[in-house]
Amino acid sequence: MHEGTYDDKITKGDNYEHTFLGEPTGLQKKSVNFTTIEEERLSKVVLVVDDDPDMTSVFSLGLQDEGFEVYTYNDPLEVLSQFRRNFYDLLLVDINMPKMNGIDLSRKLLELDSNVKICFITAGEANIEVLRELYPTRGIGCFIRKPVTIGELVRRVRAELD
């Protein structure tokens, strides 16, 4: 009887069939579909930080419907204490938040993970071109003006991740 382990490369959507000795009927086949496991691992991970819980909920639901794995925070200081290095593919960060603005938060997060991509979310009255000139921080890829439709949000997120 084999009691060791084996390694096999299984990709998204693969079915895997394994034959093993069972009791008492002898040989049995077991099919496992790894789609769900692999989709979780392969989906892009987005962190949304906005002090407005309604905004994080709407963004989260819209992005999840499009296959993204989404984590949300309403407190920028909590993000700093919970941030996981090399985990997130993209951060969506509101600029105007109490306790710490999104620009300062983004700088600190880039110190923790210099490879993460960041998009700022800003209210309609903000001048995005001025912000882009004032904060040419490495890793800041885009500015998204609120209000934004879910379709536009998803399009911008996908463009940033491609």
Mark where each language-model region is.
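Alpha4 helix (beta4-alpha4-beta5 surface) of REC/receiver domains from two-component response regulators
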Residues: 104, 125-144, 151-155
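Active-site residues of response regulator receiver
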Residues: 94
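Hydrophobic/aromatic residues positioned on beta-strands within the core alpha/beta folds
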Residues: 121-123
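Acidic, metal-coordinating helix/loop segments flanking the phosphotransfer/catalytic sites
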Residues: 72-90
